[in-house]
């Protein structure tokens, strides 16, 4: 045993151990060990899009609890760290940090700046991850923009092309006008926004018959009647059956209808007006045409069951495109395409109504003003409705028709639901989120982005005569390729047009397992032996808000590539909230910076706070929990320091032996009860960790440490451990062995959660080897002392009564007692002696009265 330092300095010790762990490669993966001994983790590659916050620490440390446990259980851990350092999130960081815009410079110049920024940011990430003691093997690090990752990502694309699961199409897609790129369904947020429902008058194509422009469903019975003064609408009284004729003010020779819309700026793109086929108000419109106000476009009046009869007037204009229903109608009814919105979110429609070049909101305001001037806007209603916005920029999305690459998704929904059920979910209720997302999918996955810093498509388009537009794919031997610099085999630069788009960043991070295993499928692999050994993986840890993206896309890719799941287990963490349980945000000023907390409390305390939250639960940051963690670190130090003074009395061979091998030397009844409780704790904590319930394991261990070990066992066994008069040598040795092995086992149980303090104490007290080494979990065999636990538990109950008595009398805990009269139980001689010592009682008398323990204290 080493000399015990006077105090524990967490700042110095945490830095010391972090450096030693790296130097000694404590966390290194061994590629030579068999597959069945490997535990492979698909670590979340943090997006290089800004500063890491306490929420990252919260989720990453929870993964590390499980990884450290599995390593100590004897698993060969494959625990990489990646960086998702390409795509729109990274571009936005670079533009903000450098105060530049990608479209104002050359592509190559912008990419170079991106590479410089991500290199700097990733170094900050590494530093923080080391400070919070993530036990990753840094030799397995990857970047999603590296040449190898680009190669594997392009392999994924080509494999899906070969399998017929990828296609290119000129079809309506979601478009972010701020970032100037197509987006996938998973990249959007539904936001509640205030707007106006505008009731606009459309004319019906002129003819001879008059028509009531006001007809409501509850009032309409049949055709309206002629009148030289006014039109008549007919209403039937349901209670009497009588028909009432009501005069209306109308214009002769013209018929009109009213539609309600939130997007009047799309009037030039109107291609039809729809009503529900069961709506009696509008059945007479079948086969007719309407004239769009201001722009005089003739559009058909059509029936479709998707119309909501009770929304607005029950008449809906179909524009190309305002929403997904417009797309459905456009396809179903073979309607023409009128595109008036540009990629920059402006109107492209030269007309007497001067809206050309205006932004969407500006055009909307101008159209409404003109409609009012011409009495074509009958009313406006303020409403709150859901608007689809870009997750990153926050901009309301447009729907444009731009050629894009898609992965077939809708056709696989049933198979993906089955995959979700095959996966082991921790916690189980998170599966519902994936199932709900899969059921809601209505678009194939658009994987192309009109950006710059990303993985390029290995694609060119032929300009050769006779095959113009033919898609040319790179050969696997060419990967990774940049179509702007490289050429397809057999073609010259003049004969091809490169694909300028880059892949959705999720298209690369969705193969994060394969970025580590170095393979995609049997046909596309960099290292087949490595891939087959590591894939499918054991664990995917991630946060719940990216179930619809990262989890879903990774499952989809593995299903399409190899007809399998990418991992066996998924553990889903919750959010870290502010102390008032509100969401952390920069605008609120309540974002916690990990570096400041590390300086104040140290890594072990922060990890303790993280371990106090159940998996999947959203948890508020708590200063009280942090203080409890600091108190626990100090108590571990002091308890270890206290018990260490006795260890020199043990024989060296007994120090080196396993607990099972010295069980015969633990002879005292209370010591044996203590070891039995310890073995029970190990079984429970091990089971909880095997089921990813780290919080339960931490709670059980902490409760045992405070309540059983510190508050009771240390006090009860203290006299025997000292035994200054050498009255009970076997009892003394028994207690010291119990202290020795209990402290050692507790350090191992705490090690996954608080790695620094446990390493420091373990190496002072027990070994030069790391407590975190592979296979160093508790091995107790079939250890179990055949004793009646009622005796030791009775001792504790009596002690509790005596402590309360002394507290009520304001007496010192060491205050002497002349006599304890105890009824309801009789203790053995060994337990009686321990009870006398801990209560400072001169004498204890047992009386056989009843089953309930009662104690009479005589001072």
UniProtKB/Swiss-Prot annotation:
KW 4Fe-4S (keyword) present: no
Q: Where is this motif: 'KMSKS' region?
A: 583-587
Q: Which EC number(s) does UniProt give? A: 6.1.1.9
Q: Which reaction does it catalyse?
A: tRNA(Val) + L-valine + ATP = L-valyl-tRNA(Val) + AMP + diphosphate
Q: Where found? A: Cytoplasm
Q: Where does the motif 'HIGH' region lie?
A: 46-56
Give one GO molecular function term: valine-tRNA ligase activity
CC per GO annotation: cytosol
Name the enzyme's class.
ligase
Q: Tell me the keywords, alphabetical order.
A: Aminoacyl-tRNA synthetase, ATP-binding, Cytoplasm, Ligase, Nucleotide-binding, Protein biosynthesis
Q: Which GO terms describe its biological process?
A: valyl-tRNA aminoacylation
Residues engaged in binding ATP: 586
State the superkingdom: Bacteria
This protein's assembly is summarised as:
Monomer.
Q: Which family does it belong to?
A: Belongs to the class-I aminoacyl-tRNA synthetase family. ValS type 2 subfamily.
Chain's role: Catalyzes the attachment of valine to tRNA(Val). As ValRS can inadvertently accommodate and process structurally similar amino acids such as threonine, to avoid such errors, it has a 'posttransfer' editing activity that hydrolyzes mischarged Thr-tRNA(Val) in a tRNA-dependent manner.
Question: How are the domains described in the entry?
Answer: ValRS has two distinct active sites: one for aminoacylation and one for editing. The misactivated threonine is translocated from the active site to the editing site.
Q: Which HAMAP family match?
A: Val_tRNA_synth_type2
Q: What is this protein called?
A: Valine--tRNA ligase
Q: Which organism is it from?
A: Rickettsia felis (strain ATCC VR-1525 / URRWXCal2) (Rickettsia azadi)
The organism's taxonomy opens as: Bacteria, Pseudomonadati, Pseudomonadota, Alphaproteobacteria, Rickettsiales
């Amino acid at each position: 045993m080493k000399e015990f330092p006077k105090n524990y300095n967490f700042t110095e010790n945490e830095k010391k151990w972090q450096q030693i762990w790296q130097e000694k490669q404590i966390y290194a993966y061994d590629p030579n060990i068999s597959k069945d001994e490997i535990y492979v983790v698909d670590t979340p590659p943090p997006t290089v899009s800004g500063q890491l916050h306490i929420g990252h620490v919260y989720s990453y440390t929870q993964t590390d609890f499980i990884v450290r446990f599995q390593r100590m259980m004897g698993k060969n851990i494959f625990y990489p760290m990646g960086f998702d350092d390409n795509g729109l999130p990274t571009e936005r960081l670079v533009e903000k940090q450098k105060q530049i815009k990608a479209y104002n410079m050359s592509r190559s110049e912008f990419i170079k700046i991106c590479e410089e920024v991500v290199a700097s940011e990733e170094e900050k990430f590494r530093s923080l991850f080391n400070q919070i003691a993530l036990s990753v093997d840094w030799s397995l690090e990857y970047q999603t923009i590296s040449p190898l990752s680009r190669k594997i990502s392009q392999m994924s694309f080509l494999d899906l092309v070969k399998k017929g699961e990828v296609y290119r199409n000129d079809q309506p897609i979601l478009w972010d006008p701020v970032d100037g790129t197509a987006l996938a369904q998973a990249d959007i947020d539904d936001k509640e926004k205030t707007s106006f429902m505008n009731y606009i008058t459309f004319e019906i194509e002129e003819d001879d018959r008059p028509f009531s422009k006001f007809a409501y469903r509850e009032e309409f019975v049949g055709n309206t009647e002629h009148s030289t003064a006014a039109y008549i609408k007919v209403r039937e009284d349901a209670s009497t059956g009588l028909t009432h004729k009501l005069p209306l003010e109308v214009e002769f020779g013209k018929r009109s209808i009213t539609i309600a819309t939130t997007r009047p700026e799309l009037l030039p793109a109107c291609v039809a007006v729809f009503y529900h086929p069961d709506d009696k108000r509008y059945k007479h419109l079948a086969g007719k045409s309407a004239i769009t106000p201001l722009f005089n476009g003739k559009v058909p009046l059509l029936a479709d069951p998707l119309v909501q009869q009770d929304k607005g007037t029950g008449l809906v204009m179909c524009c190309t495109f305002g929403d997904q229903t417009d797309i459905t109608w456009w396809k179903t009814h073979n309607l023409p395409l009128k595109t008036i919105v540009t990629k920059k979110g402006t109107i492209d429609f030269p007309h007497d109504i001067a809206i050309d070049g205006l932004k969407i909101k500006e055009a909307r305001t101008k159209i409404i003003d003109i409609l009012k001037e011409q009495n074509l806007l009958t009313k406006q209603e303020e409403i709150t409705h859901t608007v689809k916005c870009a997750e990153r920029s926050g901009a309301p999305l447009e729907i444009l028709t731009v050629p894009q690459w898609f992965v077939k998704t809708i056709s696989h929904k049933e198979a993906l639901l089955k995959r979700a059920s095959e996966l082991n979910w921790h916690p189980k209720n998170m599966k519902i989120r994936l199932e709900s997302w899969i059921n809601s999918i209505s678009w194939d996955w658009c994987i192309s982005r009109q950006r710059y810093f990303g993985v390029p498509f290995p694609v060119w388009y032929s300009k050769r005569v006779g095959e113009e537009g033919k898609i040319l794919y790179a050969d696997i031997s060419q990967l990774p390729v940049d179509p702007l610099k490289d050429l397809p085999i057999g073609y010259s630069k003049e004969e091809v047009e490169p694909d300028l788009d880059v892949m959705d960043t999720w298209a690369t991070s969705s193969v994060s397992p394969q970025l580590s295993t170095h393979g995609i499928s049997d046909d596309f692999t960099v290292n087949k032996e490595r891939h087959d050994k590591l894939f499918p993986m054991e664990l995917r840890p991630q946060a719940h808000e990216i179930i619809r993206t990262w989890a879903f896309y990774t499952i989809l890719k593995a299903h399409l590539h190899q007809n399998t799941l990418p991992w066996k287990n998924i553990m889903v963490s919750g959010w870290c909230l502010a102390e008032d349980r509100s969401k952390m945000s920069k605008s609120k000023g309540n974002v916690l910076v990990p570096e400041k907390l590390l300086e104040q409390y140290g890594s072990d305390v922060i990890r303790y706070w993280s371990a106090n939250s159940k998996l999947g639960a959203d948890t508020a940051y708590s200063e009280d929990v942090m203080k409890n963690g600091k108190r626990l670190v100090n108590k571990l130090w002091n308890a270890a320091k206290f018990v260490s003074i006795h260890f020199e009395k043990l024989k060296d061979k007994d120090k080196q032996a396993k607990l099972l091998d010295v069980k015969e030397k633990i002879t005292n009844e209370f010591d044996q009860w203590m070891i039995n409780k310890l073995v029970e704790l190990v079984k429970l904590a091990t089971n909880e960790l095997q089921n990813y319930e780290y919080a339960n394991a931490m709670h059980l261990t902490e409760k045992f440490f405070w309540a059983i070990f510190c508050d009771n066992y240390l006090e009860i066994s203290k006299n025997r451990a000292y035994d200054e008069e050498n009255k009970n040598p076997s009892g003394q040795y028994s207690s010291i062995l119990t202290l020795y092995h209990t402290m050692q086992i507790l350090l191992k149980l705490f090690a996954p959660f608080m790695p620094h303090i446990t390493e420091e104490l373990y190496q002072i007290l027990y070994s030069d080897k790391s407590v975190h080494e592979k296979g160093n979990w508790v091995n107790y065999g079939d250890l179990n002392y055949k004793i009646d636990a009622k005796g030791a538990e009775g001792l504790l109950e009596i002690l509790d009564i005596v402590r309360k008595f002394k507290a009520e009398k304001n007496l010192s805990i060491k205050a002497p007692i002349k006599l304890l009269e105890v009824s309801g139980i009789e203790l053995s001689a060994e337990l009686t002696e321990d009870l006398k010592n801990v209560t400072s009682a001169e004498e204890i008398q047992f009386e056989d009265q009843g089953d309930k323990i009662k104690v009479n204290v005589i001072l």
